[in-house]
Amino acid sequence: MRAVAHVSVARSEIRGRRLGRHAARVLTGGSACVIASARGWPRLFTPCLDVTLDAFAAHMEQRRGQPQERLEEALNAARDALACYLDGLVERVLPDVALTAFVLGDEILHAARAGGGRIYVHRKGKTTRLTPRSEPGGGLLTAPLERSETSLHSGDLILAGSSSAFSKEAVERAAAAVGRDASLPPSVLANMLTDPAAQASIGAVAVAARVR
């Protein structure tokens, strides 16, 4: 299965500077997505995100096999790449990267996360949270890897992102919009989720994907 997906990113403002703390990539023609949020020193946000996402994307794009296995292997590759990069740093407190990812299988959505992040599936007027309700700290290096899956159908809407993308205001706006028009473009919904965070300068990333 494939999905039409859109990524929306809001930058964080730290000490008067707007920094990219969050990022996401849509992979394999829309059948997979990875969302990352950097933890630690702001000056290391970009290199940590790049190292982690590059490793995940390369593994997901190049490997063959079952979707769940590819997801697991890509997460391990991302963790190893981040750990290798950090081995070369001299820091009192090492940064980390929270990762949330999903891949579409044959009528099954496979998801996993390490650290904070959320995934929801909206189908025929009902929205179900796929990720656990707990919001663990840390990321790939320190948080447990949590896995989940659910059935998937054409027309389903997947909403995923950093925890900061799912504020009460953002969720209420997106839910009301979908209630009025279930066929809203993914770009509209992704931007709705990150708008409140952008206005508050706290940073967020959201992905909206409609299954075809």
Outline where the language-model segments fall.
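Short amphipathic alpha-helical segments
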Residues: 44, 48-52, 66-74, 170, ...
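N-terminal entry segment of metal-dependent catalytic domains or homologous docking segments
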Residues: 1-59, 91-97, 108, 117-126, ...
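C-terminal catalytic subdomain
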Residues: 153-212
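Extreme N-terminal targeting and regulatory segments of eukaryotic proteins
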Residues: 1-10, 58, 67-69, 73-74, ...
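Catalytic core of PPM/PP2C metal-dependent serine/threonine phosphatase domains
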Residues: 63-122, 193-201
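Residue-level marker for buried hydrophobic side chains located in beta-strands
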Residues: 34, 113, 158-160
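Short amphipathic alpha-helical signal-transduction/dimerization elements
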Residues: 53-64, 79, 179-182
